[in-house]
From Swiss-Prot:
SUPFAM superfamilies: Ribosomal proteins L15p and L18e. It comes from Desulfotalea psychrophila (strain LSv54 / DSM 12343). Part of the 50S ribosomal subunit. GO terms for cellular component: cytosolic large ribosomal subunit. Residues 31-40 have a biased composition (Basic residues). InterPro entries: Ribosomal_uL15 (IPR030878), Ribosomal_uL15/eL18 (IPR021131), Ribosomal_uL15/eL18_sf (IPR036227), Ribosomal_uL15_bac-type (IPR005749), Ribosomal_uL15_CS (IPR001196). Disulfide bonds: none annotated. Keywords: Ribonucleoprotein, Ribosomal protein, RNA-binding, rRNA-binding. Belongs to the universal ribosomal protein uL15 family. Binds to the 23S rRNA. This is Large ribosomal subunit protein uL15.
Amino acid sequence: MLTLGNLSPQEGSTKQRKRLGRGPGSGHGKTAGRGHKGFKSRSGSGIKPGFEGGQMPLQRRLPKRGFTNIFKKEFSLVALSQLDKFEAGVVVSPAELVEAGMVKKGTLIKILANGEITKAVTVKVDKISSQAKAQIEAAGGTVVLTEVTAAE
């Protein structure tokens, strides 16, 4: 019987680790692949990422650009083709979209006109594109825009 205690990897699927500094017969003895003397042969050596030998590093030569807008609102995008999965006559609110796994809880929601919608649904969202609104209303549905706050 196969249990966690007797699991083993498939034959040939794993390599043995390279044992360095274990005598001349191994082919990796004495200097253990580090060459002779010098900074890089010592333990604890190695330059930091981004160090360019004293030359001004690239991340300091390039200028700083832009800023982060702390008032920016991030929207979760939902396509019309996703809304078509709901039954006709249903009120599609942020809670329903979270339950269906289309958006994460606590995000703002915007509907985009990707795909087609054939069912008449009432949509309650924070934002909607003009084409998406036109398609929903053409299918017999309605659009209710909520105040721009995060979904419960």
